[in-house]
Amino acid sequence: MRIVSGKFKGRTIIAPGNLSARPTTDFAKEGLFNILNNNFYFEEVKVLDLFAGTGNITYEFISRGVEDVICIEGSAASARFIKETADKMAPGKVRVLNMDVFRFLKNCKEGFDIVFADPPYEMPDIDKVVTGVFEHDLLKPGGWLVLEHSVKLKFTDHPHFVEQRHYGKVNFSFFYKKEEESVLKVVE
């Protein structure tokens, strides 16, 4: 995997072969971060990375200046890899928790500007991730949830859904915690 922009642009990170995570493609990651960059000041946001996998998205956030990222990853080997890699890049800016995502959602008392979730595409009830973020009030006012998922899934009926973007086989659905009743469109 490669960091596409920021302080560590071009850096290649090679995950151990025993990690089963599927990193987000560079093409999709570049599209996603173009959208986020036009809507957030990265130096001022707090990020939660759910189902962090190899840490690919976390590394992109810290490369772009995010100072506070929490990663939740269920695999001990993956969590260890993320911690070691993030500590080399940006010591003290990334907290990695090796735990079940749903347990974290239920017990978390912090608020986030951006929550990124990349659950396994084949995970049943993937919508429980979206429900959990909103039920447990993890987004600050104006905060976004970005869910990576397969093309088969649609979330257009969810009350916080804003829009969906496609990048090859990768899809991102954007959900917004409204400060007001009006829904803002994602600025590209």
What positions do the PLM features span?
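Class I S-adenosyl-L-methionine-dependent methyltransferase catalytic core
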Residues: 1-188
